Amino acid sequence: EMCIRDRVKQCIQSFIYGVNTPSRWGTQAPFTNITLDWTVPNDMAELNAIVGGKEQNFKYKDCVEEMRLVNKAFIEIMIEGDANGRGFQYPIPTYSITKDFDWSPTENNKLLFEMTAKYGTPYFSNYINSDMEPSDVRSMCCRLRLDLRELRKKSGGFFGSGESTGSIGVVTINMPRIAYLAKDETDFYERLEKMMNLAARSLKIKRKVITRLLDEGLYPYTKRYLGTFDNHFSTIGLVGMNEACLNAKWLKKDLSNEESQIFTKNVLNFMREKLSDYQEQYGDLYNLEATPAESTSYRLARHDRKQFPNIITATEKGNTPYYTNSSHLPVGFTSDVFTALDIQDELQTLYTSGTVFHVFLGQKLPSWEASAKLVRKIAENYRLPYYTLSPTYSICQSHGYLDGEQYKCPICGRKTEVYSRITGYYRPVQNWNDGKAEEFKNRKTYDIATSVLHKNHHETSCNVKHDEANDAKELMLFTTKTCPNCKMAKMLLDKANIKYIPIDAEEQKELTKKFAIRKAPTLLVPKQDGTYETYDNVSLIKKYIEESQK
């Protein structure tokens, strides 16, 4: 057993060091994001495991110990850091917080939350109160597009993308400039609509060009593993909503003010409606993103200040200008994390991708228990989909990891590197662009000891069984032509000699809408009371087959 552990750890260590090796243009390491499950997801639990391309006689739900072994090895290496004690920048791990997450003091839990407290490495996906499911990261090709006005969530975390999906391109709209130039609120919306129309057209043109290049064989690798850009989003984002509220002649208040929060909600809902219009007009997927704006927030503010000297940025005149990311609060607004969460929870849930709440901490949390408690509180009381705990730490070349922001080593007096999160990943503050460096100076970190939870536990959503009867008393299997899981579901049902009515979900849209089918494959099994039991992935379909044959 020790030999197996050592081999697993060696393999993962090789992977981690590999992805942190500069191999991109500009001698950069590739942006790498991985999603790790803490429990076996239900869309895979009942499927036979595949090892080396061959199906095994055991299921993924039987591999819990192997999951723990891989998770433990990964976290141990991330906690150890490199030879100088620096945390690894990549891969950025995303962990799923589900309703059945085990919060007990297990060895792996201690390691996970120690890593979070020390380096702030992981992202957490909130599957308790948000409208996401753990299977979303794998099921984009199975989603049905019945309502062209429906805006879908882009799965896969802050930097990553789920299987078979991604983004054609991103256009970020400069909100402060629109607000500064607008005479009144009506003029603001007219200017915003004009910019969004331009963004949508540009993304459509880009989609046409790269699709043509894909079809002509110029992207052979992409063609092999992806095949099509049909499930890719055309992304429109925004920057500087806080400064837009300050520049708006009818507001002149930042986002900590309730009037500005209401205006921001209205703006985001307006943008969502426009994206639905574009989906109908162009037939493509569009999404609203809280774009990271790592350099954009500084570049746009710098250009605006040159062109419009009286425009309000996040800093006073004479200081380096920058805009606050998307619809985030002013960086120096509060040290109470729950006050900030109460406001952001109402705004971030209106985006369909890119949104994340960073719990910026001045130093390492005192214990893994404190880290776990905070992660749990956020997941159980808020709806925002992604969040991080982001402690600041320093690195001395001689003495390694130092807690908090220390520009000189307290032991040897040498200059250190101060690390903090810049729009999603950790970098030495000394290497940030001028705008982000100014933001770091202005940033007020959250004091967990004095933060008070102000709201009650959200009602968690449950899956509701479809209760509409149909004349047919046979099983109905909703599939699509391109979904590989649909072929597997048909094969399993045929092999078990179970009769069913095959329904092409895309061709028979009326029936698909009638039964509110959201993804393929979905099996509807009639019950005695005339309603249907729903099995909406191949794993659950396989479980139904096995139980029906007992």
Residue ranges and their predicted role:
Residues 1, 5-230, 251, 257-411, ...:
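Conserved catalytic cores of very large enzyme subunits
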Residues 29, 34, 230-245, 414-431:
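Conserved phosphate/anionic-ligand binding catalytic regions in large, soluble enzymes, centered on
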Residues 392-411, 417, 421-472, 493:
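Intrinsic, low-complexity terminal and presequence regions
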Residues 466-498:
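Local sequence-structure signature of Cys/Sec-based thiol-disulfide redox active-site neighborhoods
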Residues 515-524:
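Structural micro-motif
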Residues 527-550:
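Non-catalytic, surface beta->alpha helical segment in thiol-disulfide oxidoreductase systems
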